[in-house]
UniProtKB/Swiss-Prot annotation:
Swiss-Prot/TrEMBL cofactor(s): Mg(2+)
UniProt remark on domains: Comprises of two domains. The C-terminal domain contains the binding site for glutamine and catalyzes the hydrolysis of this substrate to glutamate and ammonia. The N-terminal domain is anticipated to bind ATP and cobyrinate and catalyzes the ultimate synthesis of the diamide product. The ammonia produced via the glutaminase domain is probably translocated to the adjacent domain via a molecular tunnel, where it reacts with an activated intermediate.
Name of the molecule in the record: Cobyrinate a,c-diamide synthase
EC number: 6.3.5.11
SUPFAM superfamilies tied to this protein: Class I glutamine amidotransferase-like (SSF52317), P-loop containing nucleoside triphosphate hydrolases (SSF52540)
Domain GATase cobBQ-type: 247-442
Amino acid sequence: MNIKIPRIVIGGTGSGVGKTTIALALTQILRKKGLKVATFKCGPDYLDPTYHSRASQKICHNLDGWLMGKESVLNTFYQACHNVDIVIIEGMMGLFDGHSPNSEIGSTAEIAKWLASPVLVVLDTRGMARTVSAILKGLKIFDPDLNLAGAFANFTGSPSHIQLLKDASTEVPILGGLCKHSEQTFPERHLGLYSASEENVSEEKFNFWGEEGEKSLEVNSILEIANSAPEISIPVSNINTTLKRCKIGIAMDSAFHFYYEENLMRLRQAGAELVFFSPLSDSKLTDVDGLYFGGGYPEVFAPTLSKNKSLLNYIQDLSYKNIPIYAECGGLMYLSKGIKLVEGEFFPMLGLISATSIMEKKLKALGYVEVTTKKETIFGEVGLRFRGHQFRYSDLELDESNPIELVYNLRKRKSDQVSEEGYSKNSILASYIHAHWASNPNLAEGFVQSCLRK
């Protein structure tokens, strides 16, 4: 199927240059003009999409070349672009950074070329003048197949600084930028930005950057570039959503909200009705056939989670009845015996996994992984392969008197070394890995089948 939709990719020269802020400002400006905006985030990040979803009032989807592959990226793009006027895709890291230092695999540039999208690159221009032209020329000639159509100058000292940079750039037009306003930056914690749904992420900050963008971004030129994006061919899969066959409870609140939208979509297509609940505030669930605990910040909300005894007891009872339970990262911590914070305080949790979650000051794991199941799980048969990502500051202290069965063979993206992970007991499967189910469509169907057999 061929489609033509206005679109831009907002890339950067690296992390921290202000890609998210530019994307949010543009989204708000375009919505104010009456346009329906769809947003995407390149890479495995969970937090930036919460900001794009809030700004666009539509669910933001991840696009990751290594996790998903080209066909799934194109299909996800197509399915999320119905009834929208324009698409904004925020990149990750630097424009050409990805799977390898020697290729574009997994990079923003790869996604931009798959989608035949013009790219607008964001630069940190503090203390910079004519050098901006050299940087942009280098980016442009580095990959002639990439349509580098414009740039944004961020962290400028004044409007006159932005004008100086525009005058200096001869290779790529600078379409405005945002001045330094450190008091209006979005708050961060150990895993990155706070989720946009949390109370300390104010509407004032969103409005501020939208208003700043209106003053300094060349919106008409940006729209012209977006409209120049050519028609692309989408190899649309024949996806038939199965009639609802089971109900799966999805933990969704401030403590648990790291989910790839693709995973939830595939569960629905496999015939699951998704029932959202809050481990922070709900006391029980009604008639569910399975449970899915995503990642998040259980360590931040550990006191509240631990005090909700009625739900803890209810989930324990469901587990004893062999209800399939799948948990990732923060979800794994919730299933453990408890969470020990960096300060030493301990908060009991579900106790379904015989291990204690220990929070550390230093990062414990970060990066892409490939998983092969070495035993049958609630996902299905032995030998299932899929890809995922991990980013954590906690580790598990296993209870040696009650050993856990390890059911994953784990290979890091840049290594041939295989380690064991994936904690399984009865109908429970828990892991630190955030699996992207587009890497193996059988995962959602396998989980639904396990829920039907409960």
